Amino acid sequence: NVFFYELGYDMSLDAEGNYDSDRGTDTLAKYAKQFGLGEKSGLEIPESEPQISDEYSILSAIGQGTNNYTVSQLNRYVATVANRGTVYDLTLLKKTTDSDGKIIKEYEPDVAGTMDGVSSNTWDLVHQGMIDMVASTPSFSGLEVTMAGKTGTAQQSDLHPDHALFVGFAPAEDPEIAIAV
């Protein structure tokens, strides 16, 4: 969290070095939208509207603040990380058929956006950090595939318990699946 606290602080500094939380949350929102976190994921079932944090840039940088996403929205985000910048609309459908098994419609992935301007080196560093997190966590020892991931804890209030979160993808070298639980 210290790294992301510092990142949230640095994003909030103007050219003279003055701290402005709104500047930081605006920058975070810009990138969150590029990852597709500013809209529903595309699933064919009812889904909550996402909320990109609009206050407390330092807390928002570690995923707290007023961020609010469904698991499917986070899955879409981590799939974008896995494939290095293409945001897809999610779907539960591969095809529809009639009662005889004849294909009525096949569903292809729809691209909702791309993250331009992110270097291969940056994606490599993000992937390696996520691989290292999984490799250094005893809960993941013994996996037969190299996995990349990130844990998190959503804190709602003193009256509600914390929510554990894991997002990841595998195989890390050539991702085939992204998960959020």
Predicted regions and their residues:
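Beta-lactam-recognizing serine transpeptidase/beta-lactamase-like catalytic domain environment
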Residues: 1-180
